[in-house]
């Protein structure tokens, strides 16, 4: 864990708050690359993940937090209570959404999904890689980093709904063209549908969710399964109204939780035996169907009566 100080706060558009963090020691914070995020332990008792944004060569960290009407505590605290000079505990950066080398890049962002893609745009500009960024917001006043994006190259802010215009902005597939998509689950589902209709290779589409996908109901309502620890043989029932993580914590098992929505990957745990009912948004379909699978303890369940995990 790293100790950081809030070095600055400012508005980015009318719904987002930028937060600059510096190391309490005055040293440079650990290096990162576009697509990385950190866990922020807020004084209100919640842990939230925020994408790092801005220039990745800076010694400080920049995050941008959207104001959520249905906040579970994180965005409300940041917008209403956080102040310059406050001390926060943060994790080292993790990157589940890296920017790979490509001949050309398409960036598609909706809402606060702009945060990792703004960092990618700066990196692509610095390396001379051709790119186009389409950024969808409800109105111009909602846009974060609007001034910076206007100076960053081919960055276009749209106030039209992506449901009706995304197909116009999605080019035909090319061998060296890759797309990075970030925003609400519905936006990314639409982007993937458009890409599939145009013949894109799924391996050329890279995405990160800022909201969990809608829950998928499977099996019998109220079905109970058993989770078993491979290391000790201990097993406990997981009722329909509790997650695997909650059951493990109730029985004294340390679980690395962060988002608790299946969008960060912090609680992914290898599966030894059993059939996972995947409900996370962080793993690809290929990862969810691979021989060596992982289960998101915060949200996923089991199709089999028992799930044996590597804990």
Explain the meaning of each model-derived region:
Residues 32-35, 218-225, 263:
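A short, compositionally biased
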Residues 116, 253-281, 289-304:
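Local cysteine-cluster metal-coordination motifs and their immediate loop/turn environment
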Residues 160-163, 239, 300-311:
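Short flanking/linker segments adjacent to small metal-binding domains or redox-active Cys/His motifs
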Residues 37, 86-89, 250, 266, ...:
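Residue-level marker of beta-strand positions
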Residues 76-230, 237:
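FNR/FR-type flavoprotein reductase catalytic core
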Residues 1-87, 91, 137-140:
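Ferredoxin-reductase
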Residues 220-257:
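N-terminal pre-ligand scaffold of iron-sulfur
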């Amino acid at each position: 864990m790293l100790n950081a100080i809030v070095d600055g706060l400012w508005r980015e558009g009318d719904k987002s708050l930028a937060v600059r963090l510096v190391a309490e020691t005055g040293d440079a914070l650990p290096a990162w690359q576009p697509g990385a995020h950190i866990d922020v332990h807020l004084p209100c008792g919640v842990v939230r993940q925020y994408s790092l944004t801005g220039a990745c060569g800076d010694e400080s960290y920049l995050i941008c937090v959207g104001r959520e009407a249905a906040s579970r505590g994180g965005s409300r605290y940041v917008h209403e209570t956080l102040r310059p000079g406050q001390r926060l505990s943060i994790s080292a950066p993790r990157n589940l959404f890296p920017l790979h080398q490509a001949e050309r890049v398409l960036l598609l962002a909706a809402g606060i999904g702009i945060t990792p893609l703004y960092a990618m745009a700066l990196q692509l500009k610095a390396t001379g890689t051709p790119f186009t960024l389409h950024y969808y917001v409800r109105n111009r006043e909602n846009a974060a980093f609007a001034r910076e994006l206007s100076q960053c190259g081919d960055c276009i802010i749209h106030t039209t709904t992506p449901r009706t215009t995304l197909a116009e902005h999605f080019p035909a597939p090319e061998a060296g063209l890759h797309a990075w998509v970030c925003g609400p689950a519905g936006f990314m589902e639409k982007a993937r549908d458009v890409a599939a209709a145009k013949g894109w290779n799924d391996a050329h589409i890279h995405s990160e969710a800022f909201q969990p996908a809608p829950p998928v109901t499977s099996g019998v309502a109220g079905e109970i399964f058993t989770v078993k620890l491979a290391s000790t043989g201990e097993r406990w029932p997981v009722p329909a109204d509790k997650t695997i993580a909650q059951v493990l914590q109730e029985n004294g098992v340390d679980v690395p939780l962060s988002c608790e929505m299946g969008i960060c990957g912090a609680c992914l745990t290898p599966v030894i035996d059993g059939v996972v009912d995947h409900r996370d948004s962080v793993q690809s379909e290929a990862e969810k169907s691979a021989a060596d699978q992982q289960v998101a303890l915060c949200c996923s369940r089991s199709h089999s009566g028992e799930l044996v995990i590597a804990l």
